[in-house]
């Protein structure tokens, strides 16, 4: 059974390699990646803006333990600082998006983003071009990607 799965994966790898070398794929790839990166950036910006819509609690911290009070004050300050960095990254990405979506996507990428980008690429290739493409994660089930 495992040998059969291994053979199937090897066949899919060969298919992908052949596809990725084809002139047609090479011709459409820049357009596909432009769309992939644009959609990725728009999705991440929407997520980040939703996050920013939440406010850090400003009520006084009531506790008899000064260590706990200091911890929560520090936590609030850290959250506010992270929000400022988040706002700056969003603005930079919005500026880059019309002319360089790849750089905007790179700016907003984080651990695990490769899976989102691959899913978008797979969907766009299938829906727009009728091309079945397999992600590196699908072709390498024993490898952890991030």
Residues covered by each model-derived region:
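Short acidic DE-rich linear segments
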Residues: 144-146
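Short amphipathic alpha-helical heptad-repeat segments
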Residues: 2-12
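Acidic, low-complexity, intrinsically disordered interaction modules
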Residues: 36-91, 98-128, 132-135
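Charged, low-complexity interaction regions
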Residues: 18-29, 97-99
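Extended, non-membrane alpha-helical segments enriched in charged/polar residues
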Residues: 10, 14-17, 34, 38
């Amino acid at each position: 059974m495992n040998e059969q799965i291994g053979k199937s994966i090897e066949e899919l790898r060969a298919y992908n390699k052949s596809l990725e070398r084809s002139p047609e794929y090479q011709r459409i790839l820049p357009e596909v990646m432009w769309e992939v990166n644009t959609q990725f950036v728009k999705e991440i910006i929407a997520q980040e803006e939703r996050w920013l819509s939440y406010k850090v609690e400003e009520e006084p911290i009531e506790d008899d333990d000064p260590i706990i009070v200091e911890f929560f004050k520090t936590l609030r300050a850290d959250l506010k600082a992270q929000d400022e960095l988040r706002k700056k990254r969003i603005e930079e990405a919005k500026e880059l998006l019309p002319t360089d979506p790849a750089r905007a996507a790179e700016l907003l990428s984080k651990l695990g983003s490769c899976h989102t980008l691959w899913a978008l690429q797979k969907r766009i290739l299938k829906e727009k071009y009728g091309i079945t493409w397999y992600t590196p994660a699908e072709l390498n089930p024993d490898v952890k990607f991030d």
